[in-house]
Amino acid sequence: MDHQVTLTEMLDAREKRAFRQQKLLEKYHCTTICFTMNIAGPVKNNPLILRGFQLGKRLLEERMGALKIKPIYFEESNEVTGNEAFYVLDREPLMIKRITSDIEDGSDLGRLFDMDVLRADGQKVDRTELGLRPRSCLICGKSAKECSRSRIHSVLELQHRTKQLLIEAIEETDAQDAAKLAIRALLYEVCTTPKPGLVDCVNSGSHKDMDIFTFMNSASALFPYFETCVK
């Protein structure tokens, strides 16, 4: 059964997170990302939530890698009170906030991500500094802060929607990853040389209508098929 956290546990976790943020800022004097998940209800971590968190890390790290941004420091914790990751970066805060906001707004799963960006002085970078609208509610799409403040939606509604978003994103990602591996296996196989009678890097073997290039084209075209098979 999933652990249900108490108010005291959550307050302690929040205090420890704030303390850790302060220590990192004092040590590095750099832009810092604090990544957590927006999870309603008393269950803040389980295998499904952890997978969603890992997908968020993957998206963030892929985006930073594409921009050749390498963290000065990284740490992660996975407790019953939730998952946390800290990235210390020698980059301009607004640039980093643009990256994290794009991830938060770029998919349904991103609505569960809370990627705070802190300046070297500890001040949080606000979305409005980039001209972005406030984050929207998981249920109705209106302002998340307004819905939270007025408690329009029940915890059960939010939990159901959260679980739905996590499952959909994980299934989609797993299907795509499996399809990529299947395509890679086909390409590795055709590149294995020599293979008497079969298509390889130097000849077409007994095949009159295929060479390595047509094989690669055919393999690439199979991605949607493999993806559908996994689903």
Predicted regions and their residues:
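A broadly conserved sequence feature marking short terminus-proximal activation segments
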Residues: 75-126
